[in-house]
Amino acid sequence: MKKGIARLHECMGTLFASILKGEVPSHRVASGEGWYAFLDIFPRRSGHTLVIPTRSVQRLAELTQDERSSLMDGVTEVQTILGAHFGTEDFTICVHDGPLAGQEVPHVHVHVLPRTAGDQGGTLMSMWPSTETASPDHEALSALAQLLQGAP
């Protein structure tokens, strides 16, 4: 169902652009200059909020520095709101940047999930449970870091 909704809106612009225009209802949590936050309609837990830029772009790199800064200000404000309501200072914050990363709606969005004791949420490792963890290969990590430092 969720993927079907996202695909339906791709031909008309993104689902989130339609939300921003008021064409699709949302459950607003907060908004500010350059960002809008609303409850995810398929929450992973109570309070699961999406923070989006008001300009429709698919990838973080397409936002200007000011837009990225504004988006993170929105994330921080949402954390404050959710933290007060759920009595927590702990959050899972996640961005799926592109379809291979799991992005279902082609509009940048930041997931903000309040975390509380016993919520059964997992760590990053729980996202790839079949991937074995091994001892760090510092030689390979060092080589990759050197390559990445020279990347454009």
What kind of region is each of these model predictions?
Residues K2-P152:
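HIT superfamily nucleotide-processing domains
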